[in-house]
Amino acid sequence: FRPGSGIEPPQLLREVRPIYTDDARRRAIEGDVVMEIVVRRDGTVGDVRVLRTLGSGLEQRAIAAVRQWKFAPARRLGSAVDVVVEVAVGFTLR
């Protein structure tokens, strides 16, 4: 399923931030890695597909972080369901 038309979207409960690669830090790369993820009915992250990357290994770091995220699951007619959502993982140098 996808959120909308009777599907309550999942709610992010725990977000893990990604760690920069040395190469990306050296090159001062900032921006978002955009992914399509499956949020399972148990609130864990299933399949991940990268839609837009930044290079320098940041997509792997973003995937590793997102796989640790925890959600309150999406619901359809009161029951938890698997749902596909798009997320952006931001990389900002500080």
Label for each model-derived stretch:
Residues P9, V16-R17, R27-R41, L77-R94:
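A beta-hairpin/wing motif
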Residues G4-E8, L12, V16, I37, ...:
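Short, functionally important structural connectors and interaction interfaces within domains
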Residues P10, L58-A62, V81:
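Alpha-helical interaction segments
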Residues Y20-D23, A28-D32, R40-R75:
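A short, well-structured alpha-helical segment
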Residues F1-R27, A64-V66, V87:
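Acidic, low-complexity proline/glycine/alanine-rich linker and hinge segments
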